[in-house]
Amino acid sequence: MLELKDPSLLKQQAFIDGLWVSADSGETFAVTNPATGDELARIPQMGAAEAERAVLAAHRAFKPWKRKTAKERAELLQRWYALMLENQEDLARLLTAEQGKPLAEAHGELGNGMSFVQWFAEEAKRVYGDTIPQPSADKRLIVTKEPIGVTAAITPWNFPHAMITRKVAPALAAGCSMVLRPASQTPLSALALVALAERAGIPAGVFSVVTGSATQIGSVLTGHPLVRKFSFTGSTPVGKLLIGQCAETVKKVSMELGGNAPFIVFDDADLDLAVEGAMLSKFRNAGQTCVCANRIYVQDGIYERFAEKLAAAASGLRLGNGVEAGVTQGPMIDENAVRKVEEHISDALEKGARLIAGGQRHALGGSFFEPTVLTEVTAQMKVAHEETFGPLAPLFRFSSEDEVVELANATEFGLASYFYSRDIGRVLRVSEDLEYGMVGVNTAAIANEMAPFGGVKQSGLGREGSRYGIEDYLEIKYVCLGGVDR
């Protein structure tokens, strides 16, 4: 049984136009704990009709919200942030229960997610326009930035708190309203967040959460003419489909899509620091992150030593229910996720890779999978081209800088990349040559509220976080004043 200090944060209804509501059909779906299989809650299985009502409510709420001063919106966001801080233990327990990650990681996600609310509360007061030198004496040229209107978002299950706050916070700070459809595996965090937003005094209709059918709700959010901006975090194939749906009404879109992150370790790297970074990048959240190391390239001179150290560190992870003390890796989200890891391991071993750690389902059963390390991995294996999204670390060999940069860039993806070196010239060269939206040099901890998060190529469009993040929720308006010299 899930025990919370404030049991009212465990919501089993959706939130539309300031009201807690069930599905029109009365249908529900179960949310289960991936560590135990226990049912946590039953959530409304909503569809197009409920999504339509949420959009109309957001449209009605938009103008009054837009007309609030930046300071007023900032104060409400700060109240929301304060309530998250006050309830962070319950929020962490909800997150671990529905998603599976260890409690320590859940607290880490909360810290990151809450920081976006605090940051954008301040950025609300820093949306500046311009004046442009006029072409003639009788004119004045003014540029303003205005909220785009009703916005919508679909968020994933791997970070059910942070993926929401980094979309909702800039939207509300800019003066937009937002309709959110969270992943069906992890809706409890979203519902707790909107409950706290309600307590903070954010007006009805400004932030609604609709749970249920991805197809039906998604079709409304991408196709409705009143929705002017759509944000999505998820796979590249689904992102492409959603972009096509948004094209019918020419919506502004933000997409944070798939990755195939290279993690490069040069001979001159601090070996222990590189192993520490690889552990964080590869095994955090059981490898279920869009920016996790998917291909680990290690230079010939340190390959064996790195492999030995990484295998030892991976074997030292303790698997279990995330609420138990000392657990450092939880379960994978579901059976399909486990099967993909097994498929990549099997394919690699058939083609000549060597298993030096893990490689199978854990004795705990369910969707627990052992942290796995493979050596002698080559570009002909599936793991070189497909995002594993699991606790599998494949080690590739390389000889030269030029070779590894070419290998790292040989993908349609371009989200995150990492490399370790103590040569300043190499640091500058490789940083410039890697075709990725984000590059971590001698660190795997790159995500924070002050930096622009996003990818290039088929990894996405737009940026989240930083001063650039609020721009995706603004439109530029140019005003030309004539006859002012009279």
From Swiss-Prot:
Top-level lineage group: Bacteria
Induction comment from the UniProt entry of this chain: Is highly up-regulated during growth on sulfoquinovose, compared to growth on glucose or succinate (at protein level).
EC number: 1.2.1.97
Protein residues bound to NADP(+): 157-158, 181-184, 234-235, 257, 387
InterPro entries in UniProt: Ald_DH/histidinol_DH (IPR016161), Ald_DH_C (IPR016163), Ald_DH_CS_CYS (IPR016160), Ald_DH_CS_GLU (IPR029510), Ald_DH_N (IPR016162), Aldehyde_DH_dom (IPR015590), Aldehyde_DH_Superfamily (IPR050740), Succ_semiAld_DH (IPR010102)
GO-annotated biological processes: gamma-aminobutyric acid catabolic process
Cellular component terms (Gene Ontology): cytosol
Positions annotated as active site in the UniProt record: 256 (proton acceptor), 290 (nucleophile)
Pfam families given in the database record: Aldedh (PF00171)
Family: Belongs to the aldehyde dehydrogenase family.
Function of the molecule: Catalyzes the oxidation of (2S)-3-sulfolactaldehyde to (2S)-3-sulfolactate, using both NAD(+) and NADP(+) as electron acceptors. Is involved in a degradation pathway of sulfoquinovose (SQ) that allows P.putida SQ1 to use SQ as the sole carbon and energy source for growth.
Name of the protein in its database record: 3-sulfolactaldehyde dehydrogenase
